[in-house]
Amino acid sequence: MKIIDGKKVSNEVLDEIKLAVQNRKKLNLKIPHLAAVLVGDDGPSQTYVNSKIRACERVGFESSLFQFDKSITENELISEIEKINVNDDIDGFIVQLPLPKGINQENILNKVLPKKDVDGFNPINYGKMALGIETFLPATPAGIIELIKRYSIDLKGKKCLVIGRSQIVGRPISILLSQNKIFGNATVTVAHSRSNNLKEICLDSDMIISAIGIPEFIKEDMIKPGSIIIDVGICRVKDDNSLKGYRIVGDVDFDSVYDKVSLITPVPGGVGPMTISMLLKNTLRASSLND
């Protein structure tokens, strides 16, 4: 089987979380509570938050949405976050990104209490991750790691290329895969918009993790036979044959590379579903740490 089925693995993780919640109920322990902070009325952000709320319902979590008008000031938003920090009923919360112009994202994420930072973006948690200390991992990299574990992918000594250096995916996954852990020990290269000879680097890589958001950028002639492809990108491209007028694709030209790879994540249905399930797994851990 060539497909790394993120939807299947995500469902397995959610079922495990649901069972853990049921066991907590039997022990009269607190039900995990995840909150989301949403600023403005950005359509995709609203969709992402709604999907997280539905996932909470599925596993038996409590959930809350704190939605604010895009006119909110940075200081006002910080004040609201500090209220959530001291709300003992909420185990973890996320600040949905991106934030509107005029609000400094770094300042906001710095204000999220580390023990409630289930997105793993607070500098304290980010630093722990870099040092290999157990903490909340950013959800998308955590999802990639979970797929690597469940598909028994051995990266020891393998050449792994990460394309993209964002704080959300590229940087953290490059750090994690280089660590001396069961899922790591890879020889990691990070490529980005200023990298030269990208095709040559790709052809020399045993695994490629692409997180650049350029539709179908990775072609068949850029990968070596038997490589593993983790496609984090998700884009809409025009498709007159679709009822919606578009189709969803990733960074990788799936059809052209399929016969050449050993394993590949599809888009949709690959990394995407894992992000929400790992966010909930972090929230379960946050709740357990409060017992």
Question: How would you label these PLM feature ranges?
Answer:
Residues 76-88:
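Short, well-structured alpha-helical segments in soluble
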Residues 56-70, 184-190:
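Short beta-strand elements in bilobed, periplasmic/extracellular small-molecule ligand-binding domains
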Residues 31-40:
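Short beta-strand segments enriched in small/hydrophobic residues
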Residues 39-53, 135-228, 237, 244-255:
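Glycine-rich phosphate/diphosphate-binding loop of Rossmann-like nucleotide-binding domains
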Residues 105-122, 126, 230-290:
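Rossmann-fold NAD(P)-binding glycine/threonine-rich loop
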Residues 1-28:
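Positively charged, low-complexity intrinsically disordered leader regions
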Residues 95-160, 201:
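Anion-binding alpha/beta catalytic cores of soluble intermediary-metabolism enzymes, centered on
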Residues 97, 212, 232-233:
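Glycine-rich, N-terminal phosphate-binding loop of Rossmann-like dinucleotide-binding domains
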